[in-house]
């Protein structure tokens, strides 16, 4: 079952060991994995040089009160894989990233779609995997007063400092439940490493989530790739046959040979939507950080072209602007 972290004082030594362990990993990664890191992130660094010299683009007229009394399901796209989901009286925040950079490499191109101070109290925050653009310790520190619970994938707790909220680890196909809100870990195609050299022992630390409350079901894909012949999305669709909305990544698109097993582009995202048998899909994970060969707007324009090919309407694939809040199911 999932594990819960307590605040007992007799665990101080264990917490210190975890911090020292994480620090050791960082140092080893810098020493032993620098060449690999340079090769895999060279374009991110190059595309970030100009971004680092300027502030993220400002967003006008941000929502200051996202709490809706007229909805069953509403979503506000904060940007990247950060989504504020309201299901009736529950609020879920996915992969919260509010910092300007991730891992000091990828620079935010545009501000988050809502100010942290304007977030509602969050019933549960979800971390899909340990990569820096999804697990941001600085962002967790920023939102700490707002969050009641944090769920991380298997093997993820070692990287979570001691916050005031409860932090729990959830294994594949296990379900966390509180006050009628159910969160189930479901499989995706990705990897779970955080510092490069830890990939050999972090082979389970990535997940998608099924969120269920009051008869509404939402799928959050985190980061995932797609490969022809895989059955895991169909399996998820069979186990959860009434998915109202699926959040799926549509970037980076390029280079496809490198990305295809780890990141879906628009074409593969539509395939996953169909295999999940989801009623609607909301694209995410694009045009946020300087971290790929994609040009701004490319992912969205490609998705719209695929929607035309597949005869999918704007009601079936919902593309949000940053900071936009969409009522998916009204009350």
Indicate residue ranges for each PLM-predicted region.
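Pre-active-site segment of Zn-dependent metallo-hydrolases
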Residues: 55-68, 78, 84-130, 137-142, ...
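Divalent metal-coordination and catalytic microenvironments
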Residues: 85, 95, 129, 136, ...
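Short active-site oxyanion
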Residues: 72-74, 145-149
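Metallo-beta-lactamase
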Residues: 51-70, 152-216, 302-324, 328-331
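Cap/insert and terminal regions of metallo-dependent hydrolase folds
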Residues: 37-39, 124, 149-151, 155-158, ...
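Active-site metal-binding loops of divalent metal-dependent hydrolases
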Residues: 96-99, 130, 188-189, 222-224, ...
């Amino acid at each position: 079952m999932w594990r819960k972290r307590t605040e007992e004082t007799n665990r101080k030594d264990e917490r210190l060991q975890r911090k020292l362990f994480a620090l050791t990993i960082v140092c080893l990664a810098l020493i032993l994995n620098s060449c690999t890191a340079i090769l895999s992130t060279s374009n991110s660094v190059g595309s970030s040089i100009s971004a680092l010299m300027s502030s993220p683009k400002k967003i006008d007229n941000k929502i200051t009160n996202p709490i809706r009394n007229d909805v069953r399901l509403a979503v506000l796209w904060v940007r990247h894989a950060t989504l504020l989901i309201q299901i009736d009286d529950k609020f879920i925040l996915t992969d919260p990233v509010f910092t300007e950079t991730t891992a000091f490499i990828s620079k935010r191109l545009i501000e988050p779609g809502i100010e942290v101070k304007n977030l509602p109290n969050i019933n549960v925050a979800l971390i899909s995997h340990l990569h820096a653009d999804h697990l941001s310790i600085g962002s967790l520190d920023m939102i700490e007063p707002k969050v009641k619970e944090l769920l991380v994938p298997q093997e993820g707790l070692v990287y979570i400092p001691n916050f005031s909220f409860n932090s729990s680890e959830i294994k594949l196909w296990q379900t966390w439940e509180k006050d009628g809100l159910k969160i189930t870990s479901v499989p995706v195609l990705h990897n779970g490493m955080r510092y490069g050299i830890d990939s050999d022992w972090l082979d389970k630390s990535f997940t998608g989530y099924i969120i269920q409350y009051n008869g509404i079901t939402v799928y959050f894909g985190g980061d995932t790739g797609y490969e022809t012949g895989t059955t895991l999305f169909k399996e998820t669709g069979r186990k959860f046959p009434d998915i109202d909305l699926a959040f799926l990544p549509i970037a980076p698109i390029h280079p496809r040979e490198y990305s295809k097993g780890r990141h879906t582009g628009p074409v593969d995202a539509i395939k996953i939507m169909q295999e999940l048998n989801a009623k609607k899909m909301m694209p995410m994970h694009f045009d946020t950080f300087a971290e790929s060969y994609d040009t701004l707007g490319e992912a969205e324009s490609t998705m719209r072209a695929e929607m035309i090919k597949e005869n999918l309407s704007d009601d079936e694939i919902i593309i949000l602007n940053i900071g936009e809040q969409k009522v998916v199911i009204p009350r």
